[in-house]
UniProtKB/Swiss-Prot annotation:
<dbReference type="InterPro" id="IPR007454">
    <property type="entry name" value="UPF0250_YbeD-like"/>
</dbReference>
<dbReference type="Pfam" id="PF04359">
    <property type="entry name" value="DUF493"/>
</dbReference>
<dbReference type="GO" id="GO:0005829">
    <property type="term" value="C:cytosol"/>
</dbReference>
<protein>
    <recommendedName>
        <fullName>UPF0250 protein YE3006</fullName>
    </recommendedName>
</protein>
<dbReference type="InterPro" id="IPR027471">
    <property type="entry name" value="YbeD-like_sf"/>
</dbReference>
<comment type="similarity">
    <text>Belongs to the UPF0250 family.</text>
</comment>
Length: 87
């Protein structure tokens, strides 16, 4: 994935992922599990339900150390079965 993020960010820096997925109890745990593999830390994600309650938005902020970490997390979060979109 070619991005210009590397030109825009100065590492280390805070970086927030917003993950939209199906409203299942395990969604948040799966997101945190993936993030922990690449950026270990103590996370308290912010979860917001959609207006109809079918989807949840999970926001989680990491301290990114390099562009490869950012891109790998985008890819792995997007590959989760319950996830529909990662911003």
């Amino acid at each position: 994935m070619k991005t210009k993020l590397n030109e825009l960010l100065e590492f280390p820096c805070p970086f927030t992922y917003k993950v939209m997925g199906i409203a299942e109890p395990q969604l948040v745990n799966q997101v945190v599990e993936v993030v922990q593999r690449h950026a270990p830390g103590d996370y308290t994600p912010e979860v917001k339900p959609s207006s109809k309650g079918n989807y949840h938005s999970v926001s989680i902020t990491i301290t990114a150390t390099h562009i490869d970490q950012v891109e790998t997390l985008y890819e792995e979060l997007g590959n989760l079965e319950l996830v529909r979109m990662v911003l």
